[in-house]
Amino acid sequence: MTNTTSPAILNPIARPEVPQELAENIILTSLNDVYDWARLSSLWPLMYGTACCFIEFAAMIGSRFDFDRFGLVPRNSPRQADLIITSGTITMKMAPALVRLYEQMPSPKYVIAMGACTITGGMFSSDSYSAVRGVDKLIPVDVYLPGCPPRPEAIMDAIVKLRKKIANEHINERGNLAQTHRLFTAKHKMKPVPPILTGQYLNAPSRQAPPPALAAAMGIAVPALGEAVSETTSVAE
């Protein structure tokens, strides 16, 4: 007696039918994609700020910008954070503390340099003796965010760019792509000039006595300029 049933087709042409239970509960992906998705969706920034740029970063915590939708959870301990936003001027005295905070963060960790003072020294780069001319001389930087200070919308854009960078990383290349060196910024081209606020404007005639037209309109008896200056000098003495 022969078997009349057709043998099973190993490679059918038709599209296989997937049950509804499996179609709604199974995701086909790779371990690397899940690893990147989990990290970019749960960045935990360190609550760290040294100057006025931190006010703009703190504004993102409110309901208007609500950075919780990006999965950001602010942490007060560097051992629980994987993102540090250097918001504000970094001084020579603060530099060792910043490096120590960065070293205490677990890997993989990321850095966003926020503000002109953090990137190049900003307005303190020409004549300040204590400002660090670029935080990338201390720790490696992943995203540069210029501005004085940057608006919260710009901070959100920097976070989006960092998320894209994390999404393109590979779990097997994490050690090879890690930044192990520090960068050195170029010298600025600013020319220092003599200060304009020297205090000489206090001796201007307009500060010693009101204008004659204003004094005549208000009926104020204005003494001579020499008498006003002598009286001011005697009172100061």
From Swiss-Prot:
<keyword id="KW-0408">Iron</keyword>
<dbReference type="GO" id="GO:0019684">
    <property type="term" value="P:photosynthesis, light reaction"/>
</dbReference>
<keyword id="KW-0874">Quinone</keyword>
<keyword id="KW-0793">Thylakoid</keyword>
<keyword id="KW-1278">Translocase</keyword>
<keyword id="KW-0520">NAD</keyword>
<dbReference type="GO" id="GO:0008137">
    <property type="term" value="F:NADH dehydrogenase (ubiquinone) activity"/>
</dbReference>
<dbReference type="GO" id="GO:0015990">
    <property type="term" value="P:electron transport coupled proton transport"/>
</dbReference>
<keyword id="KW-0472">Membrane</keyword>
<keyword id="KW-0618">Plastoquinone</keyword>
<feature type="binding site">
    <location>
        <position position="148"/>
    </location>
    <ligand>
        <name>[4Fe-4S] cluster</name>
    </ligand>
</feature>
<dbReference type="InterPro" id="IPR006138">
    <property type="entry name" value="NADH_UQ_OxRdtase_20Kd_su"/>
</dbReference>
<comment type="subunit">
    <text>NDH-1 can be composed of about 15 different subunits; different subcomplexes with different compositions have been identified which probably have different functions.</text>
</comment>
<comment type="similarity">
    <text>Belongs to the complex I 20 kDa subunit family.</text>
</comment>
<dbReference type="GO" id="GO:0031676">
    <property type="term" value="C:plasma membrane-derived thylakoid membrane"/>
</dbReference>
<keyword id="KW-0813">Transport</keyword>
<comment type="function">
    <text>NDH-1 shuttles electrons from an unknown electron donor, via FMN and iron-sulfur (Fe-S) centers, to quinones in the respiratory and/or the photosynthetic chain. The immediate electron acceptor for the enzyme in this species is believed to be plastoquinone. Couples the redox reaction to proton translocation, and thus conserves the redox energy in a proton gradient. Cyanobacterial NDH-1 also plays a role in inorganic carbon-concentration.</text>
</comment>
<dbReference type="InterPro" id="IPR006137">
    <property type="entry name" value="NADH_UbQ_OxRdtase-like_20kDa"/>
</dbReference>
<dbReference type="GO" id="GO:0051539">
    <property type="term" value="F:4 iron, 4 sulfur cluster binding"/>
</dbReference>
<feature type="binding site">
    <location>
        <position position="53"/>
    </location>
    <ligand>
        <name>[4Fe-4S] cluster</name>
    </ligand>
</feature>
<dbReference type="GO" id="GO:0009060">
    <property type="term" value="P:aerobic respiration"/>
</dbReference>
<dbReference type="GO" id="GO:0045271">
    <property type="term" value="C:respiratory chain complex I"/>
</dbReference>
<keyword id="KW-0521">NADP</keyword>
<keyword id="KW-0411">Iron-sulfur</keyword>
<keyword id="KW-0479">Metal-binding</keyword>
<dbReference type="Pfam" id="PF01058">
    <property type="entry name" value="Oxidored_q6"/>
</dbReference>
<keyword id="KW-0004">4Fe-4S</keyword>
<dbReference type="GO" id="GO:0048038">
    <property type="term" value="F:quinone binding"/>
</dbReference>
<protein>
    <recommendedName>
        <fullName>NAD(P)H-quinone oxidoreductase subunit K</fullName>
        <ecNumber>7.1.1.-</ecNumber>
    </recommendedName>
</protein>
<feature type="binding site">
    <location>
        <position position="117"/>
    </location>
    <ligand>
        <name>[4Fe-4S] cluster</name>
    </ligand>
</feature>
<feature type="binding site">
    <location>
        <position position="52"/>
    </location>
    <ligand>
        <name>[4Fe-4S] cluster</name>
    </ligand>
</feature>
<dbReference type="GO" id="GO:0005506">
    <property type="term" value="F:iron ion binding"/>
</dbReference>
